Amino acid sequence: GSIPCGESCVYIPCISSLLGCSCKSKVCYKD
């Protein structure tokens, strides 16, 4: 599933990618 990480990635990458989040549709999600 895709859980929103509460972070957008329109201008900058997901800082929460350190926690396993990735950018999808301008919003960071965790798979």
From Swiss-Prot:
One Pfam family per UniProt: Cyclotide
Signal sequence annotation: none
SS bond partners: C5-C21, C9-C23, C14-C28
Entry keyword set: Disulfide bond, Knottin, Plant defense
Description of post-translational modifications: This is a cyclic peptide. Contains 3 disulfide bonds.
Biological process per Gene Ontology, one example term: defense response
Superkingdom in the source lineage: Eukaryota
Cyclopeptide (Gly-Asp) crosslink site(s): G1-D31
UniProt free text on domains: The presence of a 'disulfide through disulfide knot' structurally defines this protein as a knottin.
Family recorded in the similarity comment: Belongs to the cyclotide family. Bracelet subfamily.
Function: Probably participates in a plant defense mechanism (Potential). Binds to and induces leakage in phospholipd membranes, particularly ones containing 1-palmitoyl-2-oleophosphatidylethanolamine (POPE).
Name this protein carries in UniProt: Cyclotide mech-4
Organism from which the protein derives: Melicytus chathamicus (Chatham Island mahoe)
Phylogenetic classification of the source organism: Eukaryota, Viridiplantae, Streptophyta, Embryophyta, Tracheophyta
